[in-house]
Amino acid sequence: MKTRNIFVLMAEAFLFTMTACSNSTIDIDNTPDINAMPNPLPAKGEARLFTTTADGVKTLSETTAEVKSGTNMAPTTLQIDPSKQYQSIDGFGFAITYSTCYNLLKMTPEARKDFLTRTYSPQNGYGASYARISIGCNDFSSTEYSLCDEQGLEHFALQKDETEYVIPILKEILEINPDLKIIAAPWTCPKWMKVSDINTHEPYDSWTDGHLNPDYYDTYAQYFVKFVQAMKEQGINIYAVSPQNEPLNKGNCASLYMPWQEEAEFVKALAAQFKKNSLTTQIYVYDHNYDYSNIADQDDYPIKIYNALGDNFEGSELVVGAAYHDYGGSNTELDDINAQAPDKSLIFSETSIGTWNNGRDLSERLMSDMSNVVLGTVNRQCKAVLVWNLMLDKNMGPNLDGGCQTCYGAVDIDPNGYSRLSYNSHYYVITHMSSVVKPGAVRIGTKRVPDNKNLTHSEFINPDGTYATVIMNTGDSDVSLTVDDGTNHFSCDVPANGVVSCRWNK
């Protein structure tokens, strides 16, 4: 059954393995090269290309092109310039929520392994390399909770969502990709740390809204330390944290209002505790929308934190940058923040598709998400891009009352048997980047570009010396061009309303 906007995998398609893939049965038209695991590493003299079109005719379709040496006389040329270097790349990935893990664990072990290998393996898959998790609950948890609901840090403990769902899945992913980076953020502090007003310190007994009691800044920082240490004991390294998910959001099923004035003070305590406990976990401030919820005195939230803290505080080197979401405002805000703090990093840490943006319609979403979520952020200095849930069921769950009831996963699974998968735009845009742009890559410039306003692109040099480019074409006509690295070149066709990711050896 062919569809325009998503492709569907039946359970049988996942029963193949890398050594016995010929036993699989699948409708090839609906899937991305399902009879063999993707192989992003090009041979010498070869370019490897992945192509997706908004009409769904091509979905991560894998081809190769001959890399030729000598003079390139092609009139339509994209020539890279490795001498122009911008930010390094940490990776691309998805949020691993309780709901994602619940659905993954409903799959057969064989099907789950094949799906995770296809998604995360650097050698035999698309090489997704970053994950986002919550510290305590989020709006796709089994219930509202913190890791220390009873007052006193002696009661700190990982809970069922972590021990039975998130940690087992993370361990499976880490077996496939040991270099996976993980960023973690709380949706709320424990309720006993909350007050309704930081001046009166009036207790605030609610999962939603409230402020962190200033008397508990140091205690809450120790809570973060305990979390990082507890995950380390499970063999899981927390690469980075943000102090608060969506600090200007007073809603959701769990939240904590933390304007920049309060986050700055907490970050100072957090960095000091990390330093005291010999943790190298990085800290990304803010973690919310481009428009700062239209609160006037919260504009340029990260810059105000940097200016308030300065550089002379314990653990200052751990405060590396800021994280952004796109539920309000424009990604041009990244240009402004980078101009004011060029020594600080930027990452894009959350976006979702759902009923509000026709999230299951590839013809509606592919070009927009490719432009705004990945290329529009990476070309504005973001060194990582993460989208929200990797997997939800087709009923948009499991989820919590008060949280998002209208979100889709990057992948949707049919809860009737947990064997039928539907892939949405967020899966494609992340894997179009991760398949060719590897952790540690550096974004580079161009010397010559085609005179075509419908093309948007980004170029990289990987740690292994291979080059990569990702090109999107929003026009209604195919574009044939030559990609040139100054020594070698190859031909590349970018289909109308399509994306091509290329990686090649010098």
Per-region residue spans from a language model:
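Substrate-binding and catalytic surfaces of secreted/luminal carbohydrate-active proteins
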Residues: 37-76, 182-184, 221-239, 247, ...
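Short, compositionally biased low-complexity segments
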Residues: 23-28, 81-93, 140-146, 395-410
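Bacterial Sec-dependent N-terminal signal peptides
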Residues: 18-43
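N-terminal catalytic cores of secreted or lumenal carbohydrate-active enzymes
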Residues: 60-238, 264, 268
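Conserved residues at the C-terminal ends of beta-strands
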Residues: 95, 134, 244, 325, ...
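Feature marks short, surface-exposed loop/turn motifs that line or immediately flank catalytic pockets
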Residues: 25, 137-139, 190-191, 247, ...
